[in-house]
Amino acid sequence: MAEVILNNDNFKAEVLDAKGLVLVDFWATWCGPCKMLAPTVSEIADEYEGKVKVCKLDVDQAMDIAMSYGVASIPTLILFKDGEIVKKSIGVVSKAEIEAMWS
């Protein structure tokens, strides 16, 4: 399953109103570290399909959402459970570190 692409129009429905775990990758096209993390995020999306919804939010396209969650550096990963923030990770992290967010 590919990651869900988030924007101002679908963030509430896809993340805040979602039941279960949702991992949001806050990134930007110009961000080198974001590009380094992207394959790992895609791998997580495939491996945890049906268990964790994985979404990507381009901060340049939805700056207000990023700011409302205190995203000052990217990449930032935020794990939501039933619409509430559970954990936050800033910077490039390993697959194991991402998996540890919900284990």
Where are the predicted features?
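Conserved Rossmann-like nucleotide-binding pocket used by diverse enzymes
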Residues: 2, 7, 27, 53-55
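Non-catalytic, surface beta->alpha helical segment in thiol-disulfide oxidoreductase systems
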Residues: 78-103
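Structural micro-motif
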Residues: 22, 63, 69-78, 93-96
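A short beta-strand-turn-helix
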Residues: 3-22
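Conserved redox-active cysteine motifs that mediate thiol-disulfide chemistry
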Residues: 26-40
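Conserved helix-turn-beta segment immediately C-terminal to the redox Cys motif
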Residues: 19-21, 38-57
